[in-house]
Amino acid sequence: MWQLVFLTLSCDLAVATAHSGSRKGMDIAAGKKQYQVQHGACSYTFLLPETDHCRSPSSAYVPNAVQRDAPLDYDDSVQRLQVLENIMENNTQWLMKLENYIQDNMKKEMVEIQQNAVQNQTAVMIEIGTNLLNQTAEQTRKLTDVEAQVLNQTTRLELQLLEHSLSTNKLEKQILDQTSEISKLQDKNSFLEKKVLDMEDKHIVQLRSIKEEKDQLQVLVSKQNSIIEELEKQLVTATVNNSVLQKQQHDLMETVNNLLTLMSTSNPSYSLLAKDEQIIFRDCGEAFKSGLTTSGVYTLTFPNSTEEIKAYCDMETGGGGWTVIQRREDGSVDFQRTWKEYKVGFGNPSGEHWLGNEFVSQVTGQKRYVLKIHLRDWEGNEAYSLYDHFYLSNEELNYRIHLKGLTGTAGKISSISQPGNDFSTKDADNDKCICKCSQMLTGGWWFDACGPSNLNGMYYPQRQNTNKFNGIKWYYWKGSGYSLKATTMMIRPADF
């Protein structure tokens, strides 16, 4: 007979999973048989005793029958197996009923458990959902703030990007403009380089030509120096002869005066003629006022002296009374003279000449004089410069020129530099240049640092009078390279 010793019921509930089915097994543990039933998530385990002491009533009990070495009778074994089969069948039916009962009861419990679990799960899920909603709302708010910050930052970055883009476009435009300008400058530089090379070639040719002209001029200057030395010798001889002639003239004048004195005792008309011959003129203004109104050569005397000088008087221009102190008209007289020659004068008073610095200095030192410079170019144009006050210092001050009050048509600016400059000649360099202007520009003049004028320069004929540095020039009328055709310098008392 089987006895139920131990029954173990275990049920494990898992909400998340559900499994249906049954499993039966037989295990042997500690001398007992184990019977397990699986239904869904529940597991039922039964421990049954061994069947060693179960025997039929007709059989005698034999302890430890299983362990005996002698075999049982065949019939007895069959009976026992049949009994065991019956017992197993009964147990199986009983277990099936028990299983059905457990299943019926467990269904209700499972429904309740599942409902409770669902309710608990629902509450938990609602709570979790609420928390999630709250967290989501908080996260949404934070995301909104972050989004606003990101939007602001993005807007600011977009503005900066736009500004950078505009700056970049502006820089690109400037770079393009500069590139274009550089290209133009490169083209211009190439053109200038080519032009410079051409000019260098021309300059080399011109230098060669100038060198040849220089050699020719040096030869010509050497010849001219020889001629000048010869002329100086002749001039010295002529000066000596002139002194002799002046002495002879003086002796003749005394003889004539003696004769006139003797004749005046017998005829009064001769006495009147002698008085007329003894009239003395300091300048042409005095001669004009005395009734001599015809232009020509007159004899003038130095102030406070009996020394005489021949001068040309212009009695027609601007009311007359002009004493001509310089004239250039045809190039017949060489004006490249020494200091002494410019002091005493040279040339023909009726033609080209220089009256003399000493006479002009003494005359203009007595009272106020005006200076008029008349100019004529090769195209027939005429102009003049009139100075309201003019005088020359003495020889100790190198016949320094003084001018004031310029008017006229030969330029609004004086071509004779002011304040006064000293007079220079080829043998007396008194200019303000380290070079010798008189030798470079030829002629004697009131040079500054060579200056804007020289009316005593070299005379050049027509069609050879341009681009001449050493010609007869008056800068503020015709420029520095134009050599004039004719010039006249004349003085007259300011109170004439």
Swiss-Prot record:
Disulfide bonds join C284-C313, C433-C435, C437-C450. Its main location: secreted. Ca(2+) binds at D429, D431, C433, C435. It is found in: Secreted. Residues 1-18 form the signal peptide. The keyword Amino-acid biosynthesis does not apply. GO terms for biological process: angiogenesis; blood coagulation; cell differentiation; gene expression; negative regulation of angiogenesis; negative regulation of blood vessel endothelial cell migration; negative regulation of cell-substrate adhesion; negative regulation of positive chemotaxis. One of its GO terms (molecular function) is receptor ligand activity. The keyword S-adenosyl-L-methionine does not apply. Glycans are attached at N90, N120, N134, N152, N241, N304. Interacts with TEK/TIE2, competing for the same binding site as ANGPT1. Interacts with ITGA5. Interacts with SVEP1/polydom. Interacts with THBD; this interaction significantly inhibits the generation of activated PC and TAFIa/CPB2 by the thrombin/thrombomodulin complex. Binds to TEK/TIE2, competing for the ANGPT1 binding site, and modulating ANGPT1 signaling. Can induce tyrosine phosphorylation of TEK/TIE2 in the absence of ANGPT1. In the absence of angiogenic inducers, such as VEGF, ANGPT2-mediated loosening of cell-matrix contacts may induce endothelial cell apoptosis with consequent vascular regression. In concert with VEGF, it may facilitate endothelial cell migration and proliferation, thus serving as a permissive angiogenic signal. Involved in the regulation of lymphangiogenesis. The Fibrinogen C-terminal domain mediates interaction with the TEK/TIE2 receptor. This is Angiopoietin-2. It comes from Bos taurus (Bovine). The lineage of its organism: Eukaryota, Metazoa, Chordata, Craniata, Vertebrata. The gene is ANGPT2.
